[in-house]
Curated annotation (Swiss-Prot):
Heme binds at residues 11, 111, 114-115. Heme c binds at residues 11, 111, 114-115. Low-spin monoheme cytochrome c. The keyword Transport applies. It holds the Pfam family Cytochrom_C_2. This is Cytochrome c-556. SUPFAM superfamilies: Cytochromes.
Length: 122
């Protein structure tokens, strides 16, 4: 069950980072380049390490759908896309609230594409 806790923790970190970006995007927090960089770095790092947290035998006890193990290459490619898109954001860091909003649309679409297929509904 260690894998389940680890991957859920990583996913919560990504969620927290998306929340930090959303607060800037919505104008609830002022634009802060360091906060944006930190949030997107967490998303990039965790997305790249994420597929390793799903070894055979860790299929139960979480919101991870069995489809992950049935279509592992697709799952890995979706995680890789999130990591690559986060790296693109880091390479050209958004300079203002509008840039953060645009970055969130891309990253959020990546999150949704994976969750739709690979996360069980609660």
């Amino acid at each position: 069950a260690g894998e389940v806790e680890k991957r859920e923790g990583m996913m919560k970190q990504i969620g927290g980072s998306m929340g930090a970006l959303a607060a800037i995007s919505k104008g609830q927090k002022p634009y802060d380049a360091e906060a944006v960089k930190a949030a997107v770095t967490t998303i990039s790092t965790n997305a790249k390490a994420f597929p390793d947290q799903f070894p055979p035998g860790s299929e139960t006890g979480s919101a991870a759908a069995p489809a992950i193990w049935e279509n592992f290459d697709d799952f890995k490619s979706k995680a890789a896309k999130l990591g690559a898109d986060a790296d693109k954001v880091l390479a050209s860091l958004p300079a203002d609230q509008a840039g953060v909003t645009a970055a969130m649309q891309t990253l959020g679409a990546d999150c949704g594409a994976c969750h739709q297929t690979y996360r069980l509904k609660k």
